[in-house]
A protein has these predicted regions:
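Bacterial N-terminal signal peptides
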Residues: 5-17
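Short, conserved catalytic-motif segment at the N-terminal edge
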Residues: 22-77, 99, 112-116, 157, ...
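Active-site SXXK
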Residues: 26-32, 46, 52, 76-105, ...
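Short, surface-exposed loop or secondary-structure junction motifs
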Residues: 64, 117-340
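Short, glycine/proline-biased beta-turn/loop segments that scaffold the active-site neighborhood
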Residues: 102-118, 206
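Short, surface-exposed beta-strand/loop micro-motifs that present aromatic residues
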Residues: 342, 349-362
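A short acidic/glycine-rich loop-to-helix N-cap element
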Residues: 369-381
Length: 395
């Protein structure tokens, strides 16, 4: 009888721990529940960290509604473009080692790019900085050939066959091919495939045990189902996972191929928040960090995803670092509670990480919703960030 009572107590304790992870900040959980009630999301995992610890980790709702599988701290998410800062960090690690600089012509490391021409017929002479700040004008890889690519090397001739979109440095346009070209440069310079490089140099030492381009069967079982909101009924409907699962026969795409958990990505954010170090290990130099944390685009060049007709001229309030979006000045809206100099990146399915060096905190939001009108300005992101800011002010 006693053993049964002990087992019941242990089981109940496990349920409580899973439903209300500690520590938590007040108000964030209820803000996410409001989003669930509104059918904006099925569930969420939220994390807030300081330089030295986790301030908040909380789950809400379901990872899979039909199966009634609740969100948990180890739920896996496709983080999409939140992969990009990892690619930027990899490039800057190689710069720290003297193996390249972001000012190098891309053709120095990928000779095929030497033949690339601009729309005016001039030699393109793209730099690594341009391809990683979305100012290169490089064309996108699309169509059957791109879909059948097995490696990043397979994508190079496809990028080069696509017409350039504009003269390098002339404007800012979000471009996936440039970030993947950066990942290919990591492969050529390091002698490792991109997935192996980031695993050995970033994920393993940081303890990011659930971050991968290629989830195992056990990890797939923890994957959150993605949902789209039916525009007519308002109901959330499941959509297929991306990128497609299967054997390791697809490139480790530096633009958006990673899966991760909220806690894992928060480790990466804490490393950046600490100026490139964590737990006594240095990953990036102070000089390298400046490329991630200060705009590398011109002050007057509009960047970002906020459209003038909807949000005012907010694009001018952002600059772009090496693979990071950087808030130049706060404004009303989704970023109102962030400090100048806050940087980070979101993902196509609503995930987001912001690192606020002024307040000394980082915010990580994990959801899986495929059809936000603008995931970077979504009501869900705003609700999370506002609730977190209010809670931090009261501490």
């Amino acid at each position: 009888m006693n053993s049964i009572r002990v087992a019941v107590i242990v089981a109940l304790s496990a349920i409580v721990s899973a439903s209300a992870p500690d520590p938590t900040l007040p108000g964030i959980g209820s803000a996410m529940q409001d989003m669930i009630v509104k059918n904006e999301i099925a569930g969420a995992v939220t994390v807030v960290v300081s330089k030295d610890k986790v301030l908040h980790l909380e789950t809400a709702g379901f990872a899979d509604v039909v199966a009634k599988r609740p969100m948990s701290p180890d739920t896996l998410f496709w983080i999409a473009s939140m992969t990009k800062p990892v690619t930027g960090a990899a490039i800057l690690m190689l710069q720290d080692e003297g193996k390249l600089t972001v000012g190098d012509p891309v053709a120095t490391h990928l000779p095929e790019f030497a033949a690339l021409k601009t729309p005016s017929g001039k030699a393109a002479n793209l730099t690594i900085a341009q391809i990683l700040t979305h100012t290169s004008g490089l064309g996108e890889a699309s169509g059957p050939a791109a879909a059948q690519a097995k490696t990043l090397a397979d994508l190079v001739p496809i990028w080069l066959a696509a017409p350039m979109q504009y003269e390098p440095g002339e404007r800012w346009k979000y471009t996936q091919s440039g970030i993947n070209a950066g990942a290919r440069i990591v492969e050529v310079v390091s002698g490792m495939t991109f997935d192996v490089f980031v695993q050995k140099r970033i994920f393993d030492p940081l303890g990011m045990t659930s971050t991968t381009f290629y989830p195992t069967d056990a990890q797939r079982a923890r994957l959150a189902t993605a949902y789209a909101k039916n525009k007519e009924t308002g109901a959330l409907e499941a959509v297929p996972p991306r990128p497609d699962f299967g054997p390791r026969d697809r490139p480790p795409q530096g633009n958006g191929g990673l899966y991760s958990t909220a806690a894992d990505y928060a480790r990466f954010c804490r490393m950046l928040l600490n100026g490139g170090t964590l737990d006594g290990r240095r990953y990036l130099s102070a000089a390298a960090m400046k490329f991630l944390t200060t705009p590398q685009t011109a002050p007057g060049l509009p960047t970002g995803f906020f459209q003038a007709d909807t949000y005012g001229n907010r694009g001018a309030n952002y600059g772009w670092g090496i693979t990071t979006s950087i808030l130049r000045t706060p404004h009303d809206g989704v970023a109102a509670m962030l400090s100048p100099g806050t940087y980070g990146h979101g993902g196509a399915w609503g995930t987001q990480a912001w690192i606020d060096p002024v307040k000394g905190v980082a915010y990580v939001l994990m959801v899986q919703r495929s059809n936000f009108a603008n995931s970077d300005a979504s009501e869900v992101r705003r609700a999370f960030q506002e609730a977190a800011a209010r809670a931090l002010e009261k501490r």
